[in-house]
Each structure stands twice: as C-alpha cells, then as structure tokens.
Amino acid sequence: MGDPSKQDILTIFKRLRSVPTNKVCFDCGAKNPSWASITYGVFLCIDCSGSHRSLGVHLSFIRSTELDSNWSWFQLRCMQVGGNASASSFFHQHGCSTNDTNAKYNSRAAQLYREKIKSLASQATRKHGTDLWLDSCVVPPLSPPPKEEDFFASHVSPEVSDTAWASAIAEPSSLTSRPVETTLENNEGGQEQGPSVEGLNVPTKATLEVSSIIKKKPNQAKKGLGAKKGSLGAQKLANTCFNEIEKQAQAADKMKEQEDLAKVVSKEESIVSSLRLAYKDLEIQMKKDEKMNISGKKNVDSDRLGMGFGNCRSVISHSVTSDMQTIEQESPIMAKPRKKYNDDSDDSYFTSSSSYFDEPVELRSSSFSSWDDSSDSYWKKETSKDTETVLKTTGYSDRPTARRKPDYEPVENTDEAQKKFGNVKAISSDMYFGRQSQADYETRARLERLSASSSISSADLFEEPRKQPAGNYSLSSVLPNAPDMAQFKQGVRSVAGKLSVFANGVVTSIQDRYGS
C-alpha cells in the first residue's frame, strides 16, 4: 500500500475541516486550527500543538495539516474516524472536563480514547485500503451557491414585496376594468365615478389590497424595481409651518446665548472676589510689617532666615528683627604657604625626634612646673610647645656642607657673559654662573688630600660622617643619660599626682552639684 499523494491529503483535510466542530481548536477553541493530533484525531491550534509536543509522542503525535506532506493512510484514517465532536462527547461521557493539558491527556478517558481511535483506524485501513472516503465518514451537505441579493429587495418589507408580486399577477384584470370605467363616464355625461368594485369578487385579502394599491398607483407594476423607491420609509410633510420652526430655533439660540453670558458673568465675579481677598491679605501683611518695623532689605533677610511673618500662624513677634544687622563678609587673609623641604625624610625625622633630649635640663623641668598655673592656660601652653617640638625639623642650613649646594649670587645681566662666551659653541650653567672654578678647586683639594690613600669611599670623597655598623651601637648612645632619666621619672610622678588630685576635685564638684 503506497502513501497518499499531496492532492489526496489536501482533499481529505478540506472536507474534514468543513465540519463546524473541526473549525475550532479542540483544547482552547481558537478558530482555523492548522495542526492535528493523530493519536486522538482532533484539530489543534499552533499554541496547543506545542503543549501536546511537550507531552511526548507516546501520548500525542502532532502533525501539520498544511505543511506536512508525508502522511500515511493509517494516520488519515485516524483523522477520519475521529474528529473534535466525537472526542469531546467521549471525554464528557467519561467525566473528564478539565482544561489542564497534562491532567486531561494522562487520564483514564484519554487512554481509552487512544485505544478506540487506534482500533477503528486499523479496521478502516484494512477495509477501505486507499479509498478517499469511508462509509461512516460524515459528509456535510453541499450548501447552495449564494444568490446575489438585491439592495432594494433587502430593505423592502415582506408585505410590500407580496403586494408587488400580486400586482404583477392581477395586472390583466385591472386592464380589463379600465374600458368599463371609460364607457360609464361617457354614458353619464361627466359624473364622478368611484373606484372599481370588481376586485371584491376575489376571495383572498391580498388581492383586495392589490386592487386598492393599483388604483392609487397604476404605474407601479410597469416600472419594475423603480416602483419600490417609494417604500423606503420617506414620508411627505403635510401641514408644516416653517415659520414656527424658525421661531423655535431662534428662541433656542437666544436661550443658549443667555446661559453662556450668565456663566461668563459668574466667572468674572468669582475672579474679582478672589482679587479683593488677595488685596486685603496684602494690606494686612503690610500693616504687620509696619508694626514690626521691617522694611527693605531687612524684610528679605528675615524671610530668608525663616523669620518671616507671612507664613507664621502665631501672633508672637521676634525681638531679633529690631536689632537685625547685616554683616558683610571680608576678604579672607590667605595663609602663608608652608615651607617645602626637599631634605631626606629619615634624617629630618630622627633629628626632630631627638631634639627633645638635646634640650637643657632646665627647659624640660620647667614644663612640669607649669602645673601651678590655671588649667586652661597650661593646656594651651603645653599644646603649643608640643606642636613646636614636633614640627621642628632640620632646615636647609643643618645639611652637611659636602652635600649642600653652594649659594651663588646671581650674575648681573651685563655684556661680560656675551664677551666671554661669544665664540663658544656650547656652555654649561656652571660656566655661565662662575661655579666651575670653585668646583674644580674643591675637587683638586680633596684629591690631593686623598692621594696617599690606597682606597677611598664616597663618604671620604664628600667628607660625610661615617655611619656606625649595626653591631657597634651601645645603650648609652641610644638612651639618654641617667640623671636625665631620673629627672624625667620624677616629673612624670609629679604630673600623675597632680592629675589624680585634679580628677578627684572634678568628681567631687560633680557629686556636690548633681547629687550622688
């Protein structure tokens, strides 16, 4: 058995999708489903087909009814024996009414329906083979071709259409009645003739209405479709006075103008009243300012400082406004720039730290005797002394002579340099400022002094003091002398005693004042 052709597939699905229940998705009800579940023989939309794919092919096998062309006859039979209607009725019969996809297709009803579709499709495949249609397949009746609707006929009432049809039938009788009427008019000599009563012999009511209509409008049946124009609902105006209508319209316009004018007047009155209230508030505020003697710049300053009286709720006034003065900020005095040193940080640090021990004993002992003064003055003096001690560093003059650059007086700008170096191609700063001769003299003096030595060092060349080895430091060179340490300890003891006395006095005064 070969596979069905693409044309066979399209033909089968065209007829299956013509069934009304197959025009919507089986799960969500979306229109025009283009996917199908072969396992259940139902039509699905693209969103629900994705949910079925996540279930797995053992529960639902999905294919497209438009894109896939490799359908087998067994799969087509599954779709023919199934359908949305049969699947929905089967699920309802077995009590499965949930909308959850996992719960629905993992239920007992879904398992039974899968087995049923599989058995029916197998039987249909064996019985019909490659036939397109099955005996049990429901074929929808072919709908008649749509007729072209007449615009006028759709807007005409059924009664009028029936009368028009009856008028076309009764036209010969009306034509035969006309010669009788003309002969009667000739015989009676111009007397008025009433309507014809020959139509009363007709037993039906419709023909009576037709005869009356024909008398009023004898040309209606001849005009065909044009005769129906009078039945669109238009009515002829009778006994209408246009002057009265015009007067009513003018009266309505006048009423509208009066209402608009009243609205404008009321709006202007509200604006005027609000302005009056604003002026009253302003006058009250000005009177308050006059009472408080605030005017000009003081008023602005008081508002800026948060002492304005316009936003205050209380009537209490501040006395600060009477003595308010404007303080103008003077230009700040620039602080003197600190000295910048390019010295060695290590040398300056150790020199400044050791300056305390280099001071005489009298100066150090005098610091401890200052406890007899008042506490405030003592702390100020001690703070200033400590600051001076810490900030005291070696200046430019404390550097050794060998490492210090010599100070030279600037050479006056004269013509001597031009005369001296006029023909020289290149000169140095030492040659220009006259430092070359002095440097040469110092170098020659050092070399003559060290000429007898077998080896020299940089310290010998630049006449720097030699550094002691790390192992040659003694305790006496590091620590101060013994008398100094004794005096230092004695000063510390005296300071500690005075501190304890001072602390006891403070605690006693606090207890006396606030209570223990």
From Swiss-Prot:
A zinc finger (C4-type) spans 25-48. It is found in: Cytoplasm; Golgi apparatus membrane. Pfam families: ArfGap. GAP activity stimulated by phosphatidylinositol 4,5-bisphosphate (PIP2). Residues 243-263 form a coiled coil. The keyword Cytoplasm applies. Residues 170-199, 322-346, 390-414 are annotated as: Disordered. Gene3D superfamilies: Arf GTPase activating protein (1.10.220.150). Residues 173-194 have a biased composition (Polar residues). Widely expressed. Highest expression in endocrine glands (pancreas, pituitary gland, salivary gland, and prostate) and testis with a much higher expression in the testis than in the ovary. It is a peripheral membrane protein. The modification Phosphoserine is found at residues 231, 270, 274, 331, 370, 428, 451, 453, 455, 457-458. One of its GO terms (cellular component) is cytosol. GO terms for molecular function: GTPase activator activity; zinc ion binding. Residues 10-126 form the Arf-GAP domain. GO terms for biological process: COPI coating of Golgi vesicle; intracellular protein transport; protein secretion; vesicle-mediated transport. GTPase-activating protein (GAP) for ADP ribosylation factor 1 (ARF1). Hydrolysis of ARF1-bound GTP may lead to dissociation of coatomer from Golgi-derived membranes to allow fusion with target membranes. This is ADP-ribosylation factor GTPase-activating protein 3. It comes from Homo sapiens (Human). The lineage of its organism: Eukaryota, Metazoa, Chordata, Craniata, Vertebrata. The gene is ARFGAP3.
